[in-house]
């Protein structure tokens, strides 16, 4: 059964994810004029650059929407963001600086909650503003069909009739003006921005060129920490977790996760914390580049991982990182609610996050420059007295360590035999430049 409609389904209800921008405004008006019955759905994701959400549905009605609804997605989005922190669901990093998958998290929430609202209204055709070259077209496709199995997809930007008439921003602006709406294009920026309460993404246009740095970006969630004229005084902040959940900042307990995230954004944003420049692989395997902001997510992530390293053992931490990278890829690909992702997510939340109770104090400076000042938890397995270099009681003696080292002789002998075998087959050279044990000095295999 075909789920993607290439041409406008005249006379039928179409739900459009309506942002109020030029693209979706022109698309909604065009669909109404061509005989479709558009319904507008706007997601309140707590975008830091959106001033008046209530105005957006009103504009949609003016442009011809049969009905327009504002869906508050903030609570669910913050819940998914905290879940991603608990699981370390982040796979794009550059030299230890992380992209917190804030756009994929936003798409997971938008794609399910808007389609669920459409289904309530008897709307089974969905359109949005994603293009065929990007990730969002697949993310929305997956989340939409997961939510409504009867869903069909119509995107004006895949309809040649729409593209022929309104293929560019200039044409769309003139179309709106001719219809009596006097829509003026905003000044063109050197890049495009997409944001939600968890973070902001800046990409495309000038940022497609790698010689355009973060310095051309005007942050919307923080300060230009690279600008020496911007004063950024150092600041200490304490973050408290209970059973993996952030509950307090600087001693203030929050019962509302949305308010906690907003405060975390304010604290981190004062320093430009969480900004990163990433080259990543899109779902279609083509590489793209983005500049990201996520001050609150970064603040919570740093504190959470500090507690993880102090509470859990090495094998558990290794599994946490491995599963987190895999889960981050699933999230990026629009598979956050697939069974393989739910399995990894449940594992981390159940066995790792549940033990994370404690407080971490950080000193924030400029950008991602910070120091960990203190770590406190009743669950810490870090016990300095176990490994103290000072004289005193110890949990093990010198003789105990001699016995432990003696047991290592077994695997050391095995390794030496393998090195000898590698030398015999030519895999190892006896050259001193290899940095490996001099194979010529190994005992003859027959003598072992």
UniProtKB/Swiss-Prot annotation:
Keywords: Amino-acid biosynthesis, Arginine biosynthesis, ATP-binding, Cytoplasm, Ligase, Nucleotide-binding. The keyword Nucleotide-binding applies. GO terms for biological process: argininosuccinate metabolic process; L-arginine biosynthetic process; urea cycle. It is found in: Cytoplasm. L-citrulline binds at residues 99, 135, 139, 192, 201, 203, 280. L-aspartate binds at residues 131, 135-136. GO terms for molecular function: argininosuccinate synthase activity; ATP binding; protein homodimerization activity. This is Argininosuccinate synthase. It comes from Pectobacterium parmentieri.
